[in-house]
Amino acid sequence: MTTGTFPTDVAAVDTMIGTRAGPNAKLNYANLTGIRDADSKSMNFPAQYMFKDVPFSDQARDSDGEPQDPPQGADLCLPFMDRNNVQLAMIGIGPNKSEGRAMIDQHPDRFIPSHEPDPNDGPESIRTIRRLHRDDGLRAITAFPAGRDPQVPIDDPKMYAIYELCCELNLPVFCCAGIPGPRVPFAPQKVELIDQVMYDFPDLTFVTRHGCEPWVDLVGKLLLKWPNLYYSTSAFAPKHYPKAIIDYANTRGADKILYAGYFPMGLSLDRIFTELRDVPFKAEVWPKFLRENAIQVLGLDV
């Protein structure tokens, strides 16, 4: 097993950071409109039953009583980023995302704008993407297929309109795949659906989020098959990274795996970067995983 190769001198690019914490964390999930059970509706973080030590939450398992009134926006993120050598982080902008907009305006050298459109909005979602790309330097589209109401599967025609625009504007799509943590049906996020999308859109850059479980072996085959398909590690504590993904990165897939965290939604950056030191990536994989692959996918000039 490869151990002890984590580089302390590589500044990371985090492809998933939120902007709100504490009771305001619920606002991170304003787009998750399909929750039905009362227990989930009472949660600040709708998948918190899966996590312990959720930052600034006394609702999750093993809470340590951390204060419930943390700063928000850049004041929340930058101290954690700085002490863990995270140079850049991708955050959400768009309607009802004032914190994200302010973070981009105040710290354009630290935050990367992404946007999660609602495919159910039809042409309006397309117009919003075009406007954000034109006026605000939009770098990526994000998607949570199981989280919409009605749900919009990965291969739905409503998504195809967005994929077509992403190809036109050269925007990558970061899309949740696999069983979702929130208590909504998983069918829209079956990993097998990605295969048809990559076939129909050979110029589309597609990055999976949230693990692709229980179909990790399948996504490994698809990563090998499709040159523009990537995998990001969002929502997984490093000690739980799938072995198949670590093995793939260490063999044929060093260019296809991107670092993504889950701060402050479910994981602390301090915990993530402590646990990363024990992930058995080969030395040559780390710079690509932490930084270089994201720079390439997002077209960054850093």
Language-model regions: role of each:
Residues 73-80, 84, 96, 128, ...:
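Alpha-helical packing segments of well-folded alpha/beta enzyme cores
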Residues 139-140, 152-258:
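Catalytic pocket-lining loop regions of alpha/beta-barrel enzymes
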Residues 126-132, 246-249, 301:
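Short, surface-exposed amphipathic charged segments that create phosphate/polyanion-binding patches used
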Residues 1-13, 22-83, 88, 253-258, ...:
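Mid-to-C-terminal alpha-helical segments outside catalytic/metal-binding sites
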Residues 16, 81, 132, 166, ...:
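Conserved, mostly hydrophobic/aromatic
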Residues 20-22, 96-99, 120-121, 148-149, ...:
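Active-site environment of divalent metal-dependent phosphoester hydrolases
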Residues 12-16, 91-92, 114-115, 206-210, ...:
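Active-site neighborhood of phospho(di)ester-bond hydrolases with catalytic His/Asp-centered motifs
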Residues 87-88, 92-181, 185-188:
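Active-site gating/metal-coordination segments in enzymes
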